[in-house]
Amino acid sequence: MFSGVKKKMSKLLSVNKNKYKEKLIDETILGPDKLNNMDTTIHSRDDNLEQVVEQVVEQVVEQVVEQVKQIEIIKRELEENGYSVISNVYNNEEIEEYMSEFFKWYKNTENVEELHTIIHGNGIFKYFEIGHQRFAWLARTNSKIVNIFKQLWNTDELVTSFDGCCYYAPEFKGTHNYWTHTDQSSRKKGVHCYQSFLSLTNNRERTFIVYKGSHLLHEHYFTTLNIDEPYDWSILDENYISNLENKKIYVNVKAGDLVIWDSRTFHQNTCGNSNCNEERLVQYLCYLPKNDIKNNKRQQQLRRECVEERYTTSHWPYPLAIVPAQPRYNYYNPHNKIIIDYNTLPCPILHDLKEEIDKLL
């Protein structure tokens, strides 16, 4: 506990470091940007070193108190509503970097833009090694996002899945279709997973639909309809869902927001009506505790294979479900099967992220 800041402070204090020990805050809460700010503050002052450190520690404590409060709010919203929206997790610079990397890949990788709406239902990328592109890993290894999940699961070590993203271009024209679903098997009771997306765009209409509090109806749904669903994904009976209109929320998200939800929660996305011209880009992210019996040696080995072979998966970090390499559907011409030539795809540049990637495997 408190290892990151302790190391930094111990270099600055040759005496009395135990005086500040109980106040020092783990960098897993603050993130490296806050620690860098602390360094700048300390080295830019000519005051007595001990006084400077005391002031910095007090500022850190205040920041951490606020972050602890925020985590408690997130936990309460997940418990009561089944979802939570955390504002401004990504800053403008991070949004711009993700967008730049995404569109560089989207526009310049052969067949990606041309085939996207033909083979990807509901705007969701599954193919083209989407789960291992640089923009995906930039978000997936972001310390602020990882730290939120560490706090949710009360652990210092997480593992990740290799999910894709969702993109609707502004000019996309489509009609809203029903595909409300749950991402948790009927055989799993209670909380098993929190999943999320990072929004890179502002969306009110072409957005995420969630049924508030529906995670508490998960078991009721399967019991009432006498359904045994072994898989962690199933579209829900439309008649049942029609009775939940008072719980239906079109989530208003801003660029930089992180939306987290309980995998039991009933949800879907929507492209909006035929007049909607919102652009929508979100990156799906999910993490579970590394130290769990379900994260066995086979899962650990498979996770590394997924990275080496650049396999995309569902949102569950375990058990991993690998997405088939070739499209199952052609949404415009079912009789014309499309084959992706993976030999032509460029290799993503990830060497500078390797250390952070390894921590999540």
Predicted regions: what they are:
Residues 2-80, 350-361:
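Fe(II)/2-oxoglutarate
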Residues 42, 48, 66-81, 87-187:
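Non-heme Fe(II)-dependent double-stranded beta-helix
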Residues 99-103, 212, 275:
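Short Gly/aromatic-enriched secondary-structure transition segments
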Residues 112, 259-260, 264-361:
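Non-heme Fe(II)/2-oxoglutarate
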Residues 164, 182-184, 194-202, 210-212:
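Short, structured patches in soluble enzyme cores that scaffold and shape functional sites
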Residues 203-268:
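Double-stranded beta-helix
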